[in-house]
From Swiss-Prot:
Gene responsible for this protein: PRRC1
Quaternary context: Interacts with PRKAR1A; resulting in PKA activation.
Main function: May act as a regulator of the protein kinase A (PKA) activity during embryonic development.
UniProt keyword terms in alphabetical order: Cytoplasm, Golgi apparatus, Phosphoprotein
Major location (coarse): Golgi
Name of the protein in question: Protein PRRC1
Alphabetical list of PANTHER family matching this protein: PROTEIN PRRC1
Region of interest (Disordered), residue spans: 1-71, 105-167
Tissue specificity comment: Ubiquitously expressed with higher expression in kidney, liver and placenta. Detected in embryonic kidney cells (HEK293 cells) (at protein level).
Ranges annotated as biased composition (Pro residues): 59-71
Organism: Homo sapiens
Native organism taxonomy: Eukaryota, Metazoa, Chordata, Craniata, Vertebrata
Keyword Cytoplasm attributed: yes
Subcellular location: Golgi apparatus; Cytoplasm
Length: 445
């Protein structure tokens, strides 16, 4: 049957013919058979181009002739210029049935290849194949076996992974004719799909990771809970530093837009006011300047205490020690008889801010003073003392220092109440700092 169809087969033991001879034979074919010519002029060429050329690693039984759906018209062959023959062998004529089989292969026997690239295939030779194999640039060894498994077990089949929008770049290994001539065996172009990273995905992942890092930092910075934890940690560190070295407190919290001058150079007053305002405002620059009260050393009554505190501020402004617009805080202690024969020591605090027109007064808690110590201070003051209208010449602290052991004139409150004068001034200063903050415009807070 193969002889009737005009197909010559090569036995398995027969070595493949020399490709040089094949090329020479193809070039020497001067007359073109009618069947081959009509097959190329048939409109079924497009269907043939969509299938790769068939090749067999082992002899296969020939396909039964398939009759075309319509008779092929007779087309006279065109005039072909005469070429000197290189060899004397000529291919046998091809029958119309065989030409039709080669010109219109059945679709059901040859599924389309998914691994071969979608390119136009070269035209087949004018004559029928004269061997059991052929070489194609896009041939896939896993295809073309009429639906059966490949005959070469050493060649595994590869299928390209399916991905949306991602096509791996196939690497096509071309077989050279030199290796074929040396008898290495049947070679063909085998498509090995190689999965490569899409640069779009890599770039997107890099941007996402970078964006994720920055987004995490921004989210942490704007998280109220994290901010609260950081503030508490900062406060704990500052507290530890100031506990180990109390002298570091003015340097840690010094700064900001709030600048305050205390009208005294005594540390008991300056430190108390500094701690209070830095506690309320966070950062504040607080310094002390000695100011004159121009009243008696021991003021008596609320009016005298308020007068002494205000006079300290005015004296610094008159002498040019502080600017006319400078915010100042003044502290003045006085004694007052709140009840019959009941005397108390009280501190008066004044805050004056000319820029914002703020003027505030407050008082510390009252510390009881025994009557005998007040009477001693009154007896030590001359009757013709020019400042007797405002108070006494001798302070209560001086009398207590002389009368009691281990009592300081500047901080005798600890001995009588267990609370230092600095703590009393701090409590009142913190209250007046809160009132001052409430009256400031929002932009300056």
């Amino acid at each position: 049957m193969m002889e009737e169809s005009g197909i010559e087969t090569t036995p398995p033991g027969t070595p493949p013919p020399n490709p040089a001879g094949l090329a020479a034979t193809a070039m020497s074919s001067t007359p073109v058979p009618l069947a081959a010519t009509s097959s190329f002029s048939s409109p079924n060429v497009s269907s043939m181009e969509s299938f790769p050329p068939l090749a067999y690693s082992t002899p296969q039984p020939p396909l039964p002739p398939v009759r075309p759906s319509a008779p092929l018209p007779f087309v006279p062959p065109p005039a072909v210029p005469s070429v000197p023959p290189l060899v004397t062998s000529m291919p046998p004529p091809v029958s119309p049935s065989t030409a039709a089989a080669f010109g219109n292969p059945p679709v059901s026997h040859f599924p389309p290849s998914t691994s071969a690239p979608n390119t136009l295939l070269p035209a087949p030779p004018s004559g029928p194949p004269i061997s059991g194999f052929s070489v194609g640039s896009t041939y896939d060894i896993t295809r073309g076996h009429a639906g059966r498994a490949p005959q070469t077990p050493l060649m595994p089949s590869f299928s390209a992974p399916s991905g949306t929008g991602l096509l791996p770049t196939p690497i096509t290994q071309q077989a050279s004719l030199t290796s074929l001539a040396q008898g290495t065996g049947t070679t063909s172009a085998i498509t090995f799909p190689e999965e490569q990273e899409d640069p779009r995905i890599t770039r997107g992942q890099d941007e996402a990771s970078a964006g994720g890092i920055w987004g995490f930092i921004k989210g942490v910075a704007g998280n109220p809970m994290v901010k609260s934890v950081l503030d508490k940690t900062k406060h704990s560190v500052e507290s530890m530093i100031t506990t180990l070295d109390p002298g570091m407190a003015p340097y840690i919290k010094s700064g900001g837009e709030l600048d305050i001058v205390v009208t005294s150079n005594k540390e008991v007053k300056v430190a108390a006011v500094r701690d209070a305002f830095q506690e309320v405002f966070g950062l504040a620059v607080v310094v002390g300047e000695a100011g004159q009260s121009n009243i008696a050393p021991q003021p008596v009554g609320y009016a005298a205490g308020l007068k002494g505190a205000q006079e300290r501020i005015d004296s610094l402004r008159r002498t040019g020690v502080i600017h006319e617009k400078q915010t100042a805080v003044s502290v003045e202690n006085f004694i007052a008889e709140l009840l019959p024969d009941k005397w108390f020591d009280i501190g008066c605090l004044v805050v004056e801010d000319p820029v914002h027109g703020i003027h505030l007064e407050t008082f510390t808690q009252a510390t009881p003073v025994p009557l005998e110590f007040v009477q001693q201070a009154q007896s030590l003051t001359p009757q013709d003392y020019n400042l007797r209208w405002s108070g006494l010449l001798v302070t209560v602290g001086e009398v207590l220092e002389k009368s009691l052991l281990n009592v300081s004139r500047t901080d005798w409150h600890m001995a009588f109440t267990g609370m230092s004068r600095r703590q009393m001034i701090y409590s009142a200063a913190r209250a007046i700092a809160g009132m001052y903050k409430q009256r400031l415009p929002p932009r300056t807070v």
